[in-house]
């Protein structure tokens, strides 16, 4: 895989309330919100920023990962997502290099995309999502 084929897909931001967070992105920055989706115990609203998206993540499950993140760290950047041309190959290279994965095999995320998360202990403290 060449680095030129990898790109930033989106940044996920954990918020207690999308309704409270949305005015800044919509009214101040002029970003257009998409339709809310539910995945992984969270309501997700994506806002296009060129080829990159900002995802606002509000917990819909009190025991889900976004709720746990907010309880431990408060609102803020939850994850960074990279689009890779070959998700299965990227996960295999992670395993071969000894990087800790949260998802050993791809699963379906928001919008039906194939996704997998790499543990923050493997990536300098940043939760990374990979998608193809």
Each predicted region: which residue ranges?
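An N-terminus-focused feature that recognizes amino-terminal "leader" regions
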Residues: 24-28, 40-41
